From Swiss-Prot:
EC number: 2.3.1.254
CDD domains per UniProt: NAT_SF
Annotated Gene3D superfamilies: 3.40.630.30
Family of this protein: Belongs to the acetyltransferase family. ARD1 subfamily.
PROSITE patterns the UniProt entry points to: GNAT
Region: Disordered, residue numbers: 159-178
Record organism: Xenopus laevis (African clawed frog)
Protein name from the UniProt record: N-alpha-acetyltransferase 20
Stored PANTHER family: N-ALPHA-ACETYLTRANSFERASE 20
Domain N-acetyltransferase span(s) in chain numbering: 2-157
Lineage, opening ranks: Eukaryota, Metazoa, Chordata, Craniata, Vertebrata
Recorded superkingdom: Eukaryota
Amino acid sequence: MTTLRAFTCDDLFRFNNINLDPLTETYGIPFYLQYLAHWPEYFIVAEAPGGELMGYIMGKAEGSVAREEWHGHVTALSVAPEFRRLGLAAKLMELLEEISERKGGFFVDLFVRVSNQVAVNMYKQLGYSVYRTVIEYYSASNGEPDEDAYDMRKALSRDTEKKSIVPLPHPVRPEDIE
């Protein structure tokens, strides 16, 4: 049976199998520790019965309550290749959405590479829609061009009029994101 639990510092030394995917954004240890310190409830890991890490989600709460922009943000979601197509990503997303609901969020958002159609389609199946395109959000390496991202959102119950998911009519640049 899969166990969903809080991510711990020790997990940082055990999750390389999950982060080997080229579409997974990886960060330095201080970045992960910052999330653990500030938003521990938004950092969840899935563990197999034998103790192997299967996947994780890392997020945070951000935005302005006054402007009805307080929300949960998915910083990273990744499942190890051998554990994909089991509904694990959907379950991790559901947990982050529940936490965001309890924290009074208006919506949950995330950024995904435009080219990652498998992920885009999964998020759409989970009720997310494209709010805007962010031009050259992902920095490329090896002389490749930078890549655009979709900012995808799902309204939560607090956003009764679904204002947070009305798509923007034009793309934005990373520096225009609040």
